[in-house]
Amino acid sequence: MANTKSAIKRIKISERNRIRNRIRLGKIKFYTKQFLKLLEENKIEEAKKVLPEVISAIDKAAQKGTLHKNTAARKKSKLMRLLNQKLSANLSS
């Protein structure tokens, strides 16, 4: 247990931040799963509509410090790469 006033305050702050971070990461996870599911079902037009929401959630988390900027860039790049692979596969077949 915390002994000082400042330590008690830090516990409160860290708990508040943990909840905020979990909400942000949960949004990213939700939209990412939705996007990947649409790609698997070959609903590319719908996936294109969901992608900006995923990218927005990732960018907000990176801006607020929940995600490192390189991690955010890697996640966005991966999603774009998957979409482009599906698009090129559909065009070639």
UniProtKB/Swiss-Prot annotation:
Single biological process term from Gene Ontology: translation
Top-rank taxon, per record: Bacteria
Gene Ontology cellular-component terms listed: cytosol; small ribosomal subunit
UniProt KW rRNA-binding keyword: yes
Task performed by this protein: Binds directly to 16S ribosomal RNA.
Alphabetical list of PANTHER family matching this protein: 30S RIBOSOMAL PROTEIN S20, SMALL RIBOSOMAL SUBUNIT PROTEIN BS20C
Protein name: Small ribosomal subunit protein bS20
Organism in which the protein naturally occurs: Dictyoglomus thermophilum (strain ATCC 35947 / DSM 3960 / H-6-12)
